């Protein structure tokens, strides 16, 4: 059998692993020094079989509610992103070498998603429905 970790993120946020198997280091927040003795596939939330961040990756035991950090996504994470299946892009967090972090891009909102509809009569109705 195989164990899977399903995360809130998906290929919308980081397409490289799904597209061509790019490796990104993954840690479990607060368990950085724990032994990596459990093998998992780390999967995204899209309904596509290639929406995976890692296959057969050894990580510490992961429990419901744990936060996973996918490292070294760089500029390509956002630049290669897309709004497949209506998924909105997540915020981006910069992890500094000293362990501190900061948000460098906010999460998309439904208003962002529909922004290019502003030239159509339905746009005002969409905005009303979002409020």
Predicted regions and their residues:
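Charged (often Lys/Glu-rich) extended helix/loop segments that serve as interaction or gating elements
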Residues: 1-131
């Amino acid at each position: 059998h195989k164990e899977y970790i399903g995360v809130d993120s998906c290929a919308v946020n980081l397409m490289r692993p799904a597209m061509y198997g790019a490796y990104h280091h993954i840690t479990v927040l607060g368990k950085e020094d724990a032994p990596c003795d459990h093998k998992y596939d780390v999967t995204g939330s899209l309904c596509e079989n290639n929406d995976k961040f890692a296959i057969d990756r050894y990580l510490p035991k992961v429990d419901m509610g744990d936060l996973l950090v996918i490292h070294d996504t760089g500029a390509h994470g956002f630049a290669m992103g897309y709004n497949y299946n209506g998924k909105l892009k997540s915020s981006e967090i910069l992890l500094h070498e000293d362990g501190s972090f900061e948000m460098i891009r906010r999460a998309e909102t439904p208003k962002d998603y529909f922004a290019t509809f502003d030239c159509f009569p339905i746009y005002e109705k969409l905005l009303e429905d979002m409020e």
